[in-house]
Regions:
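Divalent metal-coordination and catalytic microenvironments
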Residues: 32, 47, 80, 118-121, ...
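C-terminal domain-boundary segment and adjacent tail
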Residues: 21, 49-50, 63-64, 180-228
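Bacterial N-terminal signal peptides
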Residues: 6-15
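Active-site beta->alpha N-cap acidic-glycine motif
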Residues: 18-97, 101-108, 114-115, 207
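A cross-domain feature marking catalytic cores of carbohydrate-active enzymes
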Residues: 31, 58-61, 82-84, 120-122, ...
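Alpha-helical scaffold elements lining the catalytic groove of polysaccharide deacetylases
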Residues: 39-42, 88-113, 122-168, 181-184
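Positively charged n-region of N-terminal signal peptides that target proteins for export
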Residues: 1-3
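Residue-level detector of anion-binding/catalytic polar loops
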Residues: 53, 79, 139, 146, ...
Length: 228
């Protein structure tokens, strides 16, 4: 019952177009490598309760493993982007294989889901990655805040690393692969809300900042006009 009420609140909020208020700070939480079973479920429950939408960069092999979670992410109003199929490094990968990784992932997307962003594993952008992304009409998504949650595995340390750095327009890199990361992410949401931040998807952040998203371009953050 509680989850249904929380989901209803989230969907009602997402049904209203996001409009920027003067002086309102924004940030986008992004989650790599999932979905991951119980940790993604826990994260989605917490986000729904708080009425927050995020951007998930999903691995194809995990979408194949967790189709119901992939569907839930999309149905609950979160943005989905590509993170490759295998999560193998693309540093020396051929353009043909990079394209195949994206095609194999695309086949597993929920009906109607059309990703705008591609974040290669490790954020490594080679000429091949750039060319394939541009050809497939995808922008490349980087980040501006990285607490290295996958390495720290400490809820408080991850939370503090983000809160010490975050600024208006930042894209925050996290992973929904462990309890410490998920719990830190929800703590971060609560503190940023208390600081007046609104948390949105990356696509929403780009629109709020009136920044066109161009295929093949790399996006690290979307700062307010006065920071440009």
């Amino acid at each position: 019952m509680r989850r249904c009420l929380a989901l209803g609140v989230l969907l009602s909020l997402l049904a209203v177009p996001v409009r920027g208020a003067e002086g309102q700070p924004y940030a986008a939480l992004t989650f790599d490598d999932g979905p991951s079973g119980k940790y993604t479920q826990r994260l989605l429950d917490g986000l729904a309760y708080r009425g927050v939408a995020c951007t998930f960069l999903l691995c194809g092999y995990r979408m194949e493993q967790y189709p119901e979670l992939t569907q839930r992410i999309y149905q609950e109003g979160h943005e989905i982007g590509y993170h490759g199929f295998s999560h193998d490094s693309m540093k020396t990968m051929s353009r043909r294989r990079i394209g195949q990784e994206l095609m194999d992932s695309q086949a597993l997307l929920p009906q109607g889901c059309r990703p705008v962003f591609f974040r290669p594993p490790g954020g490594v952008v080679t000429d091949g990655v750039h060319q394939v992304a541009k050809a497939r009409n995808l922008a490349l998504l980087s980040w501006s805040v990285d607490p290295r949650d996958w390495a720290l595995r400490d809820r408080q340390a991850v939370k503090q690393a983000v809160l010490d750095q975050v600024r208006d327009g930042d894209i925050i890199l996290l992973h929904d692969m462990s309890a410490s990361s998920v719990d830190a992410a929800l703590d971060i949401v609560d503190v940023l809300h208390s600081r007046g931040f609104q948390l949105v998807t990356v696509s929403q952040l780009a629109k709020l900042r009136k920044t066109p998203v161009t295929p093949g371009e790399i996006y690290t953050r979307f700062p307010p006009p006065e920071d440009n």
